[in-house]
């Protein structure tokens, strides 16, 4: 039987915020095609783990591997390697339009036609964003900002998509 290599592997990850240990020995393997949910109480370290994977918070120890290779420590390098994060809390670029926010997420892509194709895919997932494409992100509702944050993360065509509190502010379609 052939052994599969995880697309993403987190091994014994430790993250400290000053004297406070936010993560102690967290480990996780994610294989291609899997949907994985990390569940825990508030303050358990779920967001910290995602931010450490992205290189947004320093790790005290442990390894993070993508396809068996050590992941860089800088977030722009992590995105270029194939991982995107839609962070908790609707972090959008408020003074930019919806289209400009989506362009910011597409920085790893160099082909303009590929960028436009990605925008079309985002607009298929979130038709409301197409209606608001020239509107400033800061004037969108909370749910629309959440859609934009997820759409922006998808623009890089990630192989691994991390979603932190993805349903925050989203209303069910009635």
Residues of each region from the PLM?
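Glycine-rich phosphate-binding loops of nucleotide-dependent enzymes
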Residues: 2-174
């Amino acid at each position: 039987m052939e052994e599969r290599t995880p697309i993403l592997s987190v091994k014994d990850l430790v993250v400290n915020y000053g004297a406070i240990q936010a993560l102690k020995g967290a480990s996780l393997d994610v294989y291609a095609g899997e949907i994985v949910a990390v569940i825990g109480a508030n303050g358990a370290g779920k967001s910290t783990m995602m931010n450490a994977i992205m290189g947004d918070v320093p790790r005290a120890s442990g390894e993070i591997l993508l396809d068996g290779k050590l992941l860089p420590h800088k977030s722009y390098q992590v995105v270029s390697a194939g991982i995107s994060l839609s962070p908790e809390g609707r972090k959008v670029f408020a003074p930019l339009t919806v289209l400009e926010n989506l362009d910011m997420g597409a920085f790893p892509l160099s082909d303009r036609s590929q960028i436009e194709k990605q925008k079309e895919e985002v607009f298929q997932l979130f038709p409301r964003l197409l209606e608001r494409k020239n509107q400033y992100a800061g004037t969108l509702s909370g749910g629309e900002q959440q859609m934009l944050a997820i759409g922006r993360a998808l623009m890089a065509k990630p192989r691994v998509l991390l979603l932190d509190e993805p349903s925050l502010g989203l209303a069910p379609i009635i």
